[in-house]
């Protein structure tokens, strides 16, 4: 084909056309440098841009000026143009041929008209990463393979319940790590507590089975305390006690899960009914059974081991003795805030309240008989009270009961001995002679009855105090001589000559008092 040169237009319009054509050529060069082919975009450009408008103005402007050589793109356009000066009709828009295409090609053809997120450097959240359906998907349900039945496993696995999962954890967090409830390290030594905390902190990031948690973080129970008032050592294995000392960590505070104390939870405090040097007694109502009890609480906190052992002695003695009609009943005890609480039988009053009112001889005989039965009961079990006095003798429904076993010890002197009230102590106790501890209780009971009959408090020192230890006892007004001689024998300075509790019960003075009615 012969190439015809188009005359270059003159004037302002020709310069503007030349400038527009130059800009077009610059854009074509940039596309070529960027790797774009002009032939690929030719069909789209011809739909919107017509170059014949530039060629139509050329004959009306005059002779053509000297022009630059043709570019390959211009040569292509010149070759495709017809030499006829009449412009051809505009080309119709190109229609894509209906050729069979795959599904992937259809998707690419549709996406060609949509601006890609990659062009704007933004992530695509709409298009899925993986195909939703496999290429071999078949709508026929008969071709779907049936999965195999699960194999039976011998070991059982624990299933987690949704309602049991702790708040704040997702559904997948249960399988990543086991939630462990906070553990209270009560009953543990300081070294054991630190050891458990370190081991739990190392294992917190990994899964811990429930059995391992129970074994590792289990709160150790308090130690078993050997009761020295019981002769059952041959029936209990020594490994139960383990030789562990009675430490503060051994007595875990009796506090519920919600932080309430056992005393406030189980009992309603009514009033205070007694107070001593070491403890205070309250009249309480137990909430669960509606019965009245007496709760004895230590006044100050028991910090060291010696104080705790001394406080526990009363509990151990009461528990070892068991039930007797002339001994104050014992129910239970516990430690709370380093204080000892003892739940006991509630009595009407103690004899110290009647100290200002002299006791009649008949009442004194009944008192002597009943308390001697209680002393005989504890002496047969090898226990001495060592603190018999009116403050520790109680009355309930006309029955006299002996209480407060805080100074109780063993008659064989295998335990430490602590003196009671010095006003009722015999001379051998003041001289540290402990060969006849059971006779100490006999002297104290005689001195207590002597005080109650006279209606005056015994001295703790002075000439009268010495005279009583020497056996010089004044006459008791309104009492028979047989009764006065019995009281004098009970307060004999020599413990060997004093009668035992069993011998006092056999005294003839009680024959008339407790004589059985004759059978008809």
Swiss-Prot record:
Database matches in PROSITE patterns: PROTEIN_KINASE_ATP, PROTEIN_KINASE_DOM, PROTEIN_KINASE_ST
Alphabetized InterPro entries for the sequence: CC_SR_Kinase (IPR050339), Kinase-like_dom_sf (IPR011009), Prot_kinase_dom (IPR000719), Protein_kinase_ATP_BS (IPR017441), Ser/Thr_kinase_AS (IPR008271)
Top-rank taxon: Eukaryota
Catalytic residue list: 387 (proton acceptor)
Residues given in the record as ATP binding sites: 273-281, 296
Region annotation (Disordered) ranges: 1-43, 61-103
GO biological process per UniProt: negative regulation of cell cycle G2/M phase transition
Keyword ATP-binding: yes
UniProt keywords, alphabetically: ATP-binding, Kinase, Magnesium, Metal-binding, Nucleotide-binding, Phosphoprotein, Transferase, Tyrosine-protein kinase
Biased composition (Basic and acidic residues): 22-36
Pro residues compositional bias, start-end: 84-95
Domain Protein kinase, chain residue ranges per copy: 267-510
Amino acid composition bias (Basic residues), ranges on this chain: 1-16
SUPFAM superfamilies: Protein kinase-like (PK-like)
UniProt GO MF annotations: ATP binding; metal ion binding; non-membrane spanning protein tyrosine kinase activity; protein tyrosine kinase activity
Binding site for Mg(2+): 392, 404
Root EC class: transferase
Family: Belongs to the protein kinase superfamily. Ser/Thr protein kinase family. WEE1 subfamily.
Name of the protein in its database record: Wee1-like protein kinase
